[in-house]
From Swiss-Prot:
GO BP terms: arginyl-tRNA aminoacylation
Broad class of where this protein is predominantly found: cytoplasm
Lineage, uppermost ranks: Bacteria, Pseudomonadati, Pseudomonadota, Gammaproteobacteria, Enterobacterales
Assembly mode: Monomer.
Gene Ontology CC annotations of this record: cytoplasm
MF GO annotations: arginine-tRNA ligase activity; ATP binding
Protein name in the entry: Arginine--tRNA ligase
SMART domains, per database record: Arg_tRNA_synt_N, DALR_1
InterPro entries (alphabetical): aa-tRNA-synth_I_CS, Arg-tRNA-ligase, Arg-tRNA-synth_N, Arg-tRNA-synth_N_sf, ArgRS_core, DALR_anticod-bd, Rossmann-like_a/b/a_fold, tRNAsynth_Ia_anticodon-bd
Pfam families: Arg_tRNA_synt_N, DALR_1, tRNA-synt_1d
Span(s) of short sequence motif 'HIGH' region: 122-132
Keyword Ion transport applies: no
């Protein structure tokens, strides 16, 4: 149930009846304060100006045409022309009942789209580090939300599995006679990478061999392809362990590495030349873009093929966008890549559009994100100044959570404690990131993220168990409760019910904007409203069974909404804490 969409359409029709143009925007928003009702229509200002009327005068005319019978108990004009809408308790009660009767909590299914989501993208032969965390978990929250809404989502893990480094690695593996490459762990491989790089930089004969191996690999030589596949397999096997620990939905089947697009690159360069978009410049093949200017104010040149015949990331990204539209039949493509790549993507997509590879009707969206910083406000590093491995970060999260939950549950059996510590520790790391607006940098702080108060995973997980405890104490007859009506008489009941029914609106924003922090803020607010409701509206000691059952149903929908909301974020819930 999307109340905002329902009210927007009703207000829009009333505005048109009052003389507003057909494309008018009612600007219906959830009210910021209780005294302004549940929703507020703010669109009168802009429209009244066009009509040469006072906004309040237009609002009065709109009210004469606005039929919210059975939806609102009160509609009033406030200030210069805002329309405040107070939802009818009977309307709220009816839709709470409907939400409880549905597995989807009454959330409608929009028109189905095929949506490609590009996220995570680690490099082969390197261990995942904290820099991969944001793309992986923000992208996964978007995927879960879109799939819940009913879209066909194609996960695209654009791993860095191609390039000159592979000649270097294969040459070094061969030199070390590493026949057991498939059994190596990634930690070994990282050491190999460092040693290979050192030799590549210092030993010209080795470097020449590595360069030859790249050519052989790129020409499809089976021995070199097999060695390359081993490196990819070792990497992705190790990465899958991290994905599983993080409770993200990526699998080996979602790998669509850079190598996938290699066969397309010569054809793309030839096609861009044929279309007059690419030209030769100082031996390289370049596309000049009027939309981007260099320091001299001239169109910026984007190289798509180097003088030596090699291709660039831009060429791969052009091929990638083309493939996602032509082969995967994407209606929409989302890229969870950090903000530093923005200009690079915009240039690649400008070429894609000019070449006609992806029509304007298919959005290519860069859902960029900021950096994860240490308490000193600088990029998050180890004490020695090195890159923090993601596996080490998760180990520390688990260790800290173990201490925390053991302190609070001294009598819990070891296996239960481990399961709880895992849910709390991993949940804390993910939620601390997801609860921040992705476009900003954020400070990584263990104490804050593991706190049991504030907008944190432990608080949300605890809030969920608190609602469940009401049911354990109530010893409910499920069938009897299902048949009981919902009655809303108290203000706190109405506020909780209205917020519960805003779940679909929240999902819609997350799906549209790729902003999981909006879901975190909604769930945190919901938990706070439930807390106030629980305190002021006795459930188990209610004045009669009818009120008790009605309040139990509000509690039941709260539990289901918290669980489902946290699930769209990839945060595990627990039954007891």
């Amino acid at each position: 149930m999307n109340i905002q969409a329902l009210l927007s359409e009703k207000v829009r029709q009333a505005m048109i009846a009052a003389g507003a143009p057909a494309d008018c925007e009612p600007q219906v928003r959830q009210s910021a304060k209780v005294q302004f009702g549940d929703y507020q229509a703010n669109g009168m200002m802009a429209v009244a100006k066009k009509l040469g009327m006072a906004p309040r005068q237009l609002a009065e005319q709109v009210l004469t045409h606005l039929d919210l019978n059975g939806i609102a108990s009160k509609v009033e004009i406030a200030g210069p022309g805002f329309i405040n809408i107070f939802l009818d308790p009977a309307f709220l009660a009816e839709h709470v009942q409907q939400a409880l009767a549905s597995d989807r909590l009454g959330v409608a299914t929009p028109e189905k789209q095929t949506i490609v989501v590009d996220y995570s993208a680690p490099n082969v032969a390197k261990e995942m580090h904290v820099g991969h965390l944001r793309s992986t978990i923000i992208g996964d929250a978007a995927v879960r939300t879109l799939e819940f809404l009913g879209h066909k989502v194609i996960r695209a893990n654009h791993v860095g599995d191609w390039g000159t480094q592979f000649g270097m690695l294969i040459a070094w593996l061969e030199k070390q006679q590493q026949e057991n490459a498939g059994e190596m762990e990634l930690a070994d491989l990282e050491g190999f990478y460092r040693d290979a790089k050192k030799h590549y930089d210092e030993d010209e004969e080795f470097a020449e061999r590595a360069r030859n191996y790249v050519v052989k690999l790129q020409s499809g030589d089976e021995y070199f392809r097999e060695m390359w596949r081993k490196l990819v397999d070792i990497t992705m096997t190790q990465n899958q362990i991290t994905y599983d620990r993080l409770n993200v939905t990526l699998t080996r089947d979602d790998v669509m590495g850079e190598s996938l697009y290699n066969p397309m690159l010569p054809g793309i360069v030839a096609d861009l030349k044929a279309k007059g978009l690419a030209v030769e410049s100082e031996g390289a093949t370049v596309v000049f873009l009027d939309e981007f200017k260099n320091k001299e104010g001239e169109p910026m040149g984007v190289i798509i093929q180097k003088k030596d015949g090699g291709y660039l990331y831009t060429t791969t990204d052009i091929a990638c966008a083309k493939y996602r539209y032509e082969t995967l039949h994407a209606d929409r493509v989302l890229y969870y890549i950090d903000s530093r790549q923005h200009q690079h993507l915009m240039q690649a997509w400008a070429i894609v559009r000019k070449a006609g590879y992806v029509p304007e009707s298919v959005p290519l969206e860069h859902h960029m994100f900021g950096m994860m910083l240490g308490k000193d406000g600088k990029p998050f590093k180890t004490r020695a100044g090195g890159t923090v491995k993601l596996a080490d970060l998760l180990d520390e999260a688990l260790e800290r959570a173990r201490r925390l939950v053991a302190e609070k549950n001294p009598d819990m059996p070891a296996d239960g404690l481990e399961k709880l510590a895992n849910a709390v520790g991993i949940g804390a790391v993910k939620y601390a990131d997801l609860s921040k607006n992705r476009t900003t940098d954020y400070i990584f702080d263990w104490d804050n993220m593991l706190a049991f108060e504030g907008n944190t995973a432990p608080y949300m997980q605890y809030a969920y168990t608190r609602v469940l405890s009401v049911f354990r104490k109530a010893e409910i007859d499920e069938e009897q409760l299902a048949a009981a009506p919902v009655i809303i008489r108290e203000d706190r009941e109405a506020q909780l019910a209205a917020r519960l029914l805003q779940f679909e609106e929240t999902l819609t924003v997350v799906a549209r904007e790729g902003t999981p922090h909006v879901m975190c803020a909604y769930l945190y607010d919901l938990a706070g409203l439930f807390s106030g409701f629980y305190e002021h509206c006795p459930i188990l000691s209610a004045e009669n069974e009818e009120v008790r059952n009605s309040r139990l149903k509000l509690a039941q929908l709260t539990a289901k909404t918290l669980k489902l909301g946290l699930d769209t974020l990839g945060i595990e819930t627990v039954e007891r804490m």
